[in-house]
Every structure is written in structure tokens, then in C-alpha cells.
């Protein structure tokens, strides 16, 4: 899923830059992948204005700082564009075994925000393989199933990583792309306190 609305200005800016990369993905990768190339489909994205997200006001303020486009939709516009939406309110969230689960609680959604620069990549796994091909074409190397257990530092700066099998790789730069588990890598590097947000694998 590609979207531009996040909880920090930096996150929004990085995501917005990424949209333009995805639009020209094959050119960005610069090499042919025998498995084919991932394709980005720009569909736009809608988020409902509700009390739980402060009616998206803080979100839109962040987007305005960067210049990321968004469009305010009232209930009539939502019904026009997405007639299958049920705009009745069901909050607060309830468990499936709650007798009132799925029952409206009164009132209706007041509006939404449409983000035109959003969509999805048809095959995320293929996209990562595209990146692998580009890295290998540039002389890079991959080690799969090689767990990092330590990030070595000298005088407060990164000096390399240690793998589970004891292999040491010297480097002055470590890029953390561990996704939901990135906080574990940040902890190894001792930089958790520098992070504005925390990450973790979770089920929602």
C-alpha cells in the first residue's frame, strides 16, 4: 500500500517522494529483472474524518507543510464516489462476541479526506527482487537467512555488524530496513532515544 498520510512530517515527506519513484519504477531500478517488474497502480485513498483521528485536521496540516495534495469530501461526495460506504457511526470498536457488535451507535460520519497520490504495488515481493537485481548490478552482495546479532561501534560511531554465525562485516554505514522489527535493530545500535516514533510487529 502506498500512501502519503503519516503521523510525522518527515514520514509524509519520505512517502510523497516515494510515490514519484513508484510511478517510474522500472526507470528507477535501471536494470531488467528476469521475473518481470513490479507495477504501481495509483488509485487514490480515502480516510474518514472521525473523532478518533481528530477529524484528520492534524494530518492535513502536516500535508500542507510539504505541499502534498488532499481534497475535502463531505457526506454527499462520499456517497457519489463510493456509494457502497455505510456512513452510520459504529464507534467505539467492539469485540466480535459483544452483543452490540455491528450495531450503529447514532449519528453519521461527517466527511472524509481524499488523497490523490496513493495506491498499491501489484507484487511487493517482486518489487524487492527488482531492488535485489539493481543492487547486484551495481556490485552489491546479499546474504540471506543471516541474522544480525550485534552492531559494532567505535567511538560512538558504527563500525560494522556481527552475524549469528560470528561473521563480522566492517562498514561505516548500516541502513535499517527491518520493517516492523526495526526497533530491535535500533536497540542494537543504541539509537532508540533518537526516534520520534516506535515500531513493532503488531496485529490490528
What residue ranges belong to the model's regions?
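Dinucleotide-binding Rossmann-like beta1-alpha1 core, especially the glycine-rich loop
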Residues: 1-99
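Short beta-strand to alpha-helix junction loop
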Residues: 13-14, 47-55, 114-136, 143
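A conserved short coil-to-beta-strand element within the FAD-binding core of flavoproteins
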Residues: 141-159
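Central helical "cap/lid" subdomain
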Residues: 165-204
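General beta-strand structural signal in soluble alpha/beta enzymes
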Residues: 71-74, 143-144, 176
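Flavin (primarily FAD) cofactor-binding/catalytic cores of flavoenzymes
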Residues: 126, 133, 146-148, 161-166
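Local beta-strand N-terminus motif with an aromatic residue
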Residues: 30, 158, 171-172
Amino acid at each position: 500500500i502506498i500512501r502519503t498520510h503519516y503521523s510525522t512530517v518527515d514520514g509524509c515527506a519520505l512517502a510523497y517522494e516515494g510515490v514519484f519513484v513508484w510511478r517510474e519504477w522500472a526507470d528507477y531500478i535501471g536494470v531488467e529483472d528476469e521475473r518481470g517488474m513490479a507495477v504501481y497502480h495509483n488509485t487514490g485513498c480515502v480516510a474518514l474524518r472521525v473523532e478518533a483521528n481528530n477529524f484528520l485536521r492534524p494530518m492535513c496540516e502536516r500535508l500542507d507543510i510539504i505541499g502534498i495534495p488532499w481534497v475535502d469530501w463531505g457526506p454527499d461526495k462520499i456517497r457519489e464516489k463510493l456509494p457502497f460506504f455505510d456512513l452510520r457511526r459504529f464507534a467505539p470498536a467492539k469485540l466480535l462476541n459483544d452483543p452490540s457488535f455491528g450495531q450503529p451507535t447514532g449519528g453519521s460520519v461527517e466527511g472524509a479526506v481524499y488523497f490523490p497520490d496513493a495506491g498499491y504495488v501489484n507484487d511487493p515481493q517482486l518489487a524487492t527482487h527488482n531492488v535485489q537485481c539493481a543492487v547486484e548490478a551495481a556490485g552489491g552482495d546479499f546474504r540471506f537467512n543471516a541474522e544480525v546479532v550485534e552492531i559494532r561501534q567505535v567511538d560512538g560511531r558504527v563500525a560494522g555488524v556481527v552475524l549469528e554465525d560470528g561473521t563480522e562485516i566492517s562498514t561505516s554505514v548500516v541502513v535499517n530496513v527491518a520493517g516492523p522489527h526495526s526497533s530491535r535493530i535500533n536497540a542494537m545500535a543504541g539509537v532508540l532515544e533518537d526516534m520520534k516514533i516506535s515500531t513493532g510487529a503488531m496485529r490490528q
